[in-house]
Amino acid sequence: METYTGIPEELKFAVLERIQPTEPEREKLFAIQEELASQVKIAAEKLGIPGVLVKMVGSAARGTWLSGTHDIDVFISFPEETSRKDLETLGMAIAREVARYAEHAEDRHAEHPYLNITYKGFDVDLVPCFRVASASQIKSAVDRTPFHNDFVKPRIKGHEDEVLLLKQFMRGGGVYGSELKTQGFSGYLTELLVIRYGSFKNTIYAACSWKPGEKIDIMQHGEIEHEEPLVVIDPTDPRRNVAAALSLDKFCTFIDHCREFLKNPELSFFFPAPILPLEDSEILEKLESRKSTQLAVVFKTPDVVEDVLFPQLYKMEQAVAALLKEYDFTVIKTGVWSGNTETAVMMELISGTLPNVKKHIGPPVWVKVHAEKFKEKYQAADGVFGGYIENGKYIFEILRKYPTARGLLEDRLMSCSLGKQVHQSVNEGFEIIENAGICRLKEYDFRIYLRKWI
């Protein structure tokens, strides 16, 4: 059984010194929140829209935000009887009125539209929602968020630093963020873990023993079964698993991060050293040492938000791997990367080239009808090198249709399940890059990704 060391208090203090918001930061945040709330009210009055209330939600409203992060969630709530059409039309009208004072504005879409703005250096989401009586009566997914605020705020009071430590620890391990690109832990989930276990330290110790199917049910709802690796029943809505976005790999990465940290608690688990981009010479050295085949399918990045793009990229990744395996290529690993202009689906194969000949195994000779049909088909076929019997079965050595992975992908990629926007982009044009050709991709973030890849 593994023996873990304690977590030095001085280490926690050192981390908190770097992540606790300063008093000037707090004052600025509160001032911006008040400004935004006032502007929403003024906009509603100006547009003649009654019954609108403003609620600040998220980590900024709960005191669990990390220094240097400037995210504010402003919920523009409408009476429950408001129609969805009016919610979207009137809510966005108010948001756009507020956005007149912003440096930048961008329409975004979850279950319904909302507006993301940059306001005095803060990243602000202006989100219309229905004002319902309880989270069990929500009319759209965002309606439950104000109830999260009401549940967490009184219970987390006095434990805000524990949440900050857990968030930064998850960041250091690459598992923080519930967006579909990351598939990690959300801010709300980290808060619930601290509420459940009482502290950062207790959460870390508990996670060391987690297994897939781990269930946390703070309010003892226990009504619905979920199949995700970690199940954290939403205290405000017993039908929902707060950890539904967490992938198995990120779940296990967090467990491993906790175990390694407790063996040797260090600042680097919170603040890992920056990863440097891979230089061309290093790429060539790694290719030479690995002796495998690196392939990248490169195409123009679709103009959609990441939460739409990345599920499609992961779908493409799986489909391409399945295609390669179908044609006898051995896939070591796959991955995806997306930048502002180009996107790459990465594959590493044991070899990108196979022999021209393929051993095709037929039925046993004694299965007369099937065996004779098999023999007749391949005896008369073109591209057959010869037939014989081995272990009681007919064997024909036939010409392989795709001896190279590049040729296979160039010919069959569009037959894969790619997702709507990715399919459109790939259909407009794609490039297969192999081995040293990867040096063509110069984007800084890609070279950082590549260092982790190979």
Curated annotation (Swiss-Prot):
It holds the Pfam family NTP_transf_2. Its cofactor is Mg(2+). It catalyses: a tRNA precursor + 2 CTP + ATP = a tRNA with a 3' CCA end + 3 diphosphate; a tRNA with a 3' CCA end + 2 CTP + ATP = a tRNA with a 3' CCACCA end + 3 diphosphate. Mg(2+) binds at residues 71, 73, 125. It is an enzyme of class 2 (transferase). ATP binds at residues 59, 62, 148, 167, 176. CDD domains: NT_2-5OAS_ClassI-CCAase. GO terms for biological process: RNA repair; tRNA 3'-terminal CCA addition. A single active site specifically recognizes both ATP and CTP and is responsible for their addition. This is CCA-adding enzyme. It comes from Methanosarcina barkeri (strain Fusaro / DSM 804).
